[in-house]
Amino acid sequence: MRIILLGAPGAGKGTQANFIMNKFGIPQISTGDMLRAAIKAGTELGKQAKSVIDAGQLVSDEIILGLIKERIAQDDCEKGFLLDGFPRTIPQADGLKEMGIAVDYVVEFDVADDVIVERMAGRRAHLPSGRTYHNVYNPPKEEGKDDITGEELVVRDDDKEETVRARLGVYHDQTAPLISYYGKEAEAGNTKYLKFDGTKQVAEVSAELEKALA
């Protein structure tokens, strides 16, 4: 079971990725984790990646695809894997295909931008302890105050509306072509494209996912 996950920041992708990993016993493959591991291990691709990063440049698709090929050859990927954060572009998707890496399911979590902004802009944090709240879903006992210390809660920069909307803009620019690409792949019978309503309760989405992937 080889799965690609698509979903905007705040769409609940991470929660459902954990569910899939635990339910089906397949590892999540993150390109960032792979890069760090390869550099630390000093593999040939790791050395190439390190020299590129040290020069302040972006790691090429060729190196990333090579790392993915090495990673999925490992024993824990025998039953499949979950690709998160890759591919981000059409050339990367083409690269996977050219390397003979078949994708069984492309899973998209669909949540309207305004809902994501509400989810993220409603977050409040007590920075010294790391405790987090939400104005709607998990409000503090007293508005704007930490439950334990009574200290002021803040909105983290990442959760500010303008930051969230900027990240969503980047996501849509990158991902819209991929959604079209994998839609065509599904029509051609090369993969299955599954779309879920990410505004539903977490357990409900998990149940739908389990049924669709079973």
Curated annotation (Swiss-Prot):
Region (LID), start-end ranges: 122-159
Entry GO terms, CC: cytoplasm
CDD domains with a match to the protein in the record: ADK (cd01428)
Catalysed reactions, as listed in the record: AMP + ATP = 2 ADP
An example Gene Ontology molecular-function term: adenylate kinase activity
Signal peptide start and end residues: none
Location in or out of the cell: Cytoplasm
Region (NMP), start-end ranges: 30-59
Residue positions binding AMP: 31, 36, 57-59, 85-88, 92, 156, 167
Keyword Cytoplasm appears in the UniProt entry: yes
InterPro entries per the UniProt record, alphabetical: Adenyl_kin_sub, Adenylat/UMP-CMP_kin, Adenylat_kinase_CS, Adenylate_kinase_lid-dom, P-loop_NTPase
Keywords: ATP-binding, Cytoplasm, Kinase, Nucleotide biosynthesis, Nucleotide-binding, Transferase
Residues at which ATP binds: 10-15, 123, 132-133, 200
Main location: cytoplasm
GO biological process: AMP salvage
EC number: 2.7.4.3
Pathway entry: Purine metabolism; AMP biosynthesis via salvage pathway; AMP from ADP: step 1/1
Matches recorded under PROSITE patterns: ADENYLATE_KINASE
Protein purpose: Catalyzes the reversible transfer of the terminal phosphate group between ATP and AMP. Plays an important role in cellular energy homeostasis and in adenine nucleotide metabolism.
Family of the protein in this entry: Belongs to the adenylate kinase family.
Domain notes per entry: Consists of three domains, a large central CORE domain and two small peripheral domains, NMPbind and LID, which undergo movements during catalysis. The LID domain closes over the site of phosphoryl transfer upon ATP binding. Assembling and dissambling the active center during each catalytic cycle provides an effective means to prevent ATP hydrolysis.
Database matches in PANTHER family: NUCLEOTIDE KINASE
Cited HAMAP family: Adenylate_kinase_Adk
Assembly information from the UniProt record: Monomer.
Name assigned to this protein: Adenylate kinase
Underlying gene: adk
